[in-house]
Amino acid sequence: MKVIIIGMWNSFPKGMEPTSGYLIQKDGTSILLDAGSGVAASIQKYTSIHDIDHIFLSHYHHDHAGDIEAFMLARKMARQLRRTERNLKIYGPESGTIVKTIRRAKYSTFMPVRATKNYTVGPFQVEFHRNEHPVETYAIRVTDNEGGVFVHTSDSSYRGSLVRFAFGADVLVIDCKLYEGFDGRAEGHMNAEYAGRLASKSDAQMTILANLPHHGELEVLLDSAKQHPVNVIKLAEAGMKIEI
């Protein structure tokens, strides 16, 4: 599978770089994990917005789902112009005010996400893990038909169950909103030291620190994470391409 990081900033875009969005492609199938602010515009550097038939939302905070209505409007236009016969499928938690909007939309279909529910989309098997975050939030694990594994933690504090969920990932994208020394448990985030701990204990082949803060020296996040024995570890970059 091919993964393209569309955006990775926390809270709001930085310049022309969006918040959370991860495009995954294989065998003619494209899925999008999260549709944060700026993702609908930036994704068009890599594919047509009309080629995205499946969007998985980890939760409905704006930096993870702010552009979902732009994708819905794009699909409405494509359907009305007869460019496609398919509805846009939007997978997400059942709690959240946007769910009513999605359910009412004529050209979009809501697909509920739960920790016990899996979906198969083309060559991908998609699984979920309930996170520790103020709103209903899920980590997402994507396994392709050749056994390649991509895991996106989304927003969460550190949990042993998250280690088990992410174990053995080829690529693990971890929430790293906070620098070491900040306690993110109350707001459901990981600092860099805990991100490194998760990477180490889950034995990920490559770890990418994402949901990045807008302040400080980002290289310090890597230094903190590397206190734990990890394999390859990098900071997320908009436009980064990864082959699994």
Feature names for model-found ranges:
Residues 1-47, 136-154, 171:
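Conserved beta-strand hairpin/beta-sheet module of binuclear metal-dependent hydrolase folds
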Residues 38-87:
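Active-site metal-binding motif and surrounding structural segment of the metallo-beta-lactamase
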Residues 159-241:
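Cap/insert and terminal regions of metallo-dependent hydrolase folds
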Residues 32-36, 53-59, 63, 67, ...:
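Active-site neighborhood of phospho(di)ester-bond hydrolases with catalytic His/Asp-centered motifs
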Residues 29, 78-79, 83-88, 202-206, ...:
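A short helix->loop->beta-strand "cap" motif at the edges of active sites that frequently abuts
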Residues 13-17, 117-180:
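Active-site-proximal loop/helix segment associated with metal-binding centers of metalloenzymes
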Residues 83-137, 144-146:
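Metallo-beta-lactamase
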Residues 66-75, 100-101, 217-225:
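Metal-dependent catalytic neighborhoods of phosphoester/phosphodiester hydrolases
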